[in-house]
C-alpha cells in the first residue's frame, strides 16, 4: 500500500518514506478538533532530524549489526541518506544502505507507536519546536508572523517549515554574519 514511499517517494529523495507513511497513520487515528495530529507529526519530524541513525534496536535481526551512525539533521531522505553513506563509506545502492533504511523505518514506527500510546493513555504532551540560533536569525526576516516569538512583524513572510536553514543555505548565513556587528 505504501511501497511508493520508498527512497523518498518513488526515488525522488524527498521526505523519508517512513515519516510520510507514519504521518498518514497518525492523521487517521488522531484526527480531532484540536489538530493534535499536527503536533504529533511535528514532534516526529524534529525527533527524526535530531536522531543518529541507525539505532541498535534491530541489530539482533540485522545482516549488518553495529552500523556507523550519522545524525539525520532533516526529514529529507536524500540529505539523511547522503550524510550516512558518506560517513559509512558505502554506496547509495549498497545492501548496507538498504539495511540502514529498514532499521530507520522500524525505529520511526516504534517511536510513533510510543507517541500514539501516550496519546490514547492521556499522557500526550506536545513538545514545542525550538529552532537553532542560526535558524532563528533566518526566521526573523523570512518567517511568517505565525512563528510568534521568532519572526518579527515586518518579516518577509515567505518561508515556512521547521528545518535547519543552514543545511541548504550555508552561504546566506555566512553573508549575514559578516554584515552583523560583533558584540
What is the role of each PLM region?
Residues 5-14, 93-97:
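A short glycine/serine-rich beta->alpha loop
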Residues 1, 28-43:
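Phosphate-handling active-site elements
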Residues 10-24:
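Conserved phosphate/anionic-ligand binding catalytic regions in large, soluble enzymes, centered on
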Residues 22-26, 41-117, 124-129, 136-139:
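Amphipathic alpha-helical interface segments
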Residues 1-3, 83:
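Acidic-glycine-rich active-site phosphate/pyrophosphate-binding loop
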Amino acid at each position: 500500500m505504501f511501497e511508493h514511499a520508498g527512497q523518498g517517494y518513488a526515488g525522488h529523495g524527498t521526505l523519508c518514506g517512513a515519516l510520510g507513511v507514519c504521518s498518514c497513520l497518525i492523521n487517521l487515528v488522531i484526527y480531532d478538533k484540536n489538530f493534535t495530529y499536527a503536533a504529533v507529526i511535528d514532534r516526529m519530524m524534529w525527533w527524526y532530524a535530531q536522531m543518529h541513525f541507525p539505532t541498535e534496536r534491530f541489530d539482533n535481526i540485522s545482516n549488518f549489526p553495529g552500523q556507523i551512525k550519522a545524525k539525520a539533521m532533516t526529514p529529507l531522505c536524500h540529505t539523511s541518506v547522503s550524510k550516512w553513506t558518506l560517513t559509512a563509506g558505502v554506496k547509495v545502492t549498497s545492501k548496507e544502505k538498504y539495511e540502514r533504511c529498514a532499521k530507520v523505518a522500524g525505529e520511526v514506527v516504534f517511536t510513533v507507536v510510543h507517541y500514539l500510546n501516550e496519546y490514547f493513555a492521556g499522557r500526550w504532551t506536545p513538545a514545542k519546536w525550538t529552532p537553532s540560533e542560526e535558524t532563528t536569525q533566518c526566521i526573523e526576516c523570512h518567517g511568517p508572523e505565525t512563528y510568534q516569538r521568532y519572526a518579527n512583524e515586518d518579516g518577509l513572510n515567505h518561508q515556512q517549515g521547521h528545518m535547519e536553514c543552514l543545511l541548504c543555505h550555508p552561504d546566506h548565513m555566512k553573508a549575514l554574519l559578516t554584515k552583523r556587528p560583533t558584540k
